Amino acid sequence: MKPQQLATQKFSEHYGYSAAQTVFAPGRVNIIGEHTDYNDGFVMPCAINYGMAVSFSKRDDSVWRVYAIDIDEQDEFDLSRPIEPSEHKWANYVRGVVKYIQEKCPEFKQGADLAMTSDVPMSSGLSSSAALEISIGKTAQVLGDLPLGLAEIALIGQQAENKFVGANCGNMDQLTSALGQKDQVIMIDCRSLEITPTPVPHGYSIAIINSNVKHDLVTGEYNSRRQECEFAARFFGVKALRDVTPEQFIERAAELQAENELAYKRAKHIISENQRVLEAVEALKANDMVKLGQLMAGSHDSMRDDFEITIPEIDYLVELAQIAIGKNGGARMTGGGFGGCIVCLVPDGKVEHLRRIIADNYEKQTGIKETFHLCTACDGVHLI
């Protein structure tokens, strides 16, 4: 059963009446451009056909009752009182979004009953949290008929995750969940929020392979990467690493390396990765899948060697995928790192070959069974 059907059904069972409306917000996969978003850089994700559905109805008071179907828990809070953190981590994503919507729209106090469910695997790097934030943001916007655009809802979602949940994420995940387009990857300039849609090449599929090694980014590694990038930006005297050209980096690389080895390595990844994203857009437009494959491989190597966010299981998955796909297409880790998924752009005729090579080798080598998802690029958040 699809999340939107499950949300509607469980809403009726839980509350004893039918939901008025349902919102669906997709997860995302990032084709290339990793950890560049919070450096004001470039990313190239697409929204995917896995996501979060929220069925909801207005109440005649200011209370939100939120039923999380997948874990059978409920949260309740009152929009006419200051919104405080909950002991349930999932509930803080909901409360945080509503809190920052109220900062923008102080008159918003419309109560509601909600039931929500997701088929985005948790801790996979496919943005289960952004799908939750954007679905809640859109729900609130509909409930209150609020004058909020999709990009604003995305930035409110990011604010909630940064300030209320305590994960220092960039804005890519939320922007993609809000602004995704069917059959397109979207290059996002994370500073101007300008979007450049580019069609997914004809005859290619997007495969996402979950290593099933879990990660949780609220803890230290992610935040330390941000601090190292900020150190490097200060070293170059710029607002963000986006403002450093490859030539400027090369000119002062030895000096930065002598001062702070880690900041040097992190900056090397970010600056080269921004360049790879810009080249990837051109490769896609030219239908040059050999070039795109090389850029994806370069991105993975840089994440492994300079940003140091991959793990042996992920490196092995990428290696297997690259063997299966060959030169036309590519594979790399996607998401924050330390587990999660790899993304592949694979010729349709090689999908089963890819699936088989990984099934025959990954578990044998690691003792963990992978999960294989074929995805399509989808529209962003919408009412169903």
UniProtKB/Swiss-Prot annotation:
Its EC number is 2.7.1.6. InterPro entries: Galactokinase (IPR000705), Galactokinase_bac (IPR022963), Galactokinase_CS (IPR019741), GalKase_N (IPR019539), GHMP_kinase_C_dom (IPR013750), GHMP_kinase_C_sf (IPR036554), GHMP_kinase_N_dom (IPR006204), GHMP_knse_ATP-bd_CS (IPR006203). Substrate binds at E34, H35, T36, D37, Y222. Keywords: ATP-binding, Carbohydrate metabolism, Cytoplasm, Galactose metabolism, Kinase, Magnesium, Metal-binding, Nucleotide-binding, Transferase. Its main location: cytoplasm. GO terms for cellular component: cytosol. GO terms for biological process: galactose metabolic process. One of its GO terms (molecular function) is magnesium ion binding. It is found in: Cytoplasm. ATP binds at S123, S124, G125, L126, S127, S128, S129. The active site is at D173. Disulfide bonds: none annotated. Mg(2+) binds at S129, E161. It comes from the Bacteria. The record marks R28 as: Transition state stabilizer. Pathway: Carbohydrate metabolism; galactose metabolism. PANTHER family: GALACTOKINASE-RELATED, MEVALONATE KINASE/GALACTOKINASE. Belongs to the GHMP kinase family. GalK subfamily. Catalyzes the transfer of the gamma-phosphate of ATP to D-galactose to form alpha-D-galactose-1-phosphate (Gal-1-P). This is Galactokinase. It comes from Actinobacillus pleuropneumoniae serotype 5b (strain L20). The lineage of its organism: Bacteria, Pseudomonadati, Pseudomonadota, Gammaproteobacteria, Pasteurellales.
